[in-house]
Amino acid sequence: MELTPREKDKLLIFTAALLAERRKARGLKLNYPEAVALITAAIMEGARDGRTVAELMHEGTTVLGREDVMDGVAEMIPEIQVEATFPDGTKLVTVHHPIV
């Protein structure tokens, strides 16, 4: 199977998000890479489902709360930018203060 670098990146994000989801389900607080991966994957999947950029900008702030992450992680992520594939092309989704 031949994958482009972009496809490999998407799979890596999905795998990290899956791991983060499992750890969160076990009651563990997420670290920086896990939190970023989980929020990023949610945005990418929302785009694939046909949601709008505005909807995803809002939904990106509801994926995780401060109680879901280790101390200091929320402050380390002032924004997340995701280049997501929508039905009408690729767009940049920026989520400001994703963990509140």
UniProtKB/Swiss-Prot annotation:
It comes from Cupriavidus necator (strain ATCC 17699 / DSM 428 / KCTC 22496 / NCIMB 10442 / H16 / Stanier 337). Pathway: Nitrogen metabolism; urea degradation; CO(2) and NH(3) from urea (urease route): step 1/1. It is an enzyme of class 3 (hydrolase). It is found in: Cytoplasm. It catalyses: urea + 2 H2O + H(+) = hydrogencarbonate + 2 NH4(+). This is Urease subunit gamma. Pfam families: Urease_gamma. Belongs to the urease gamma subunit family.
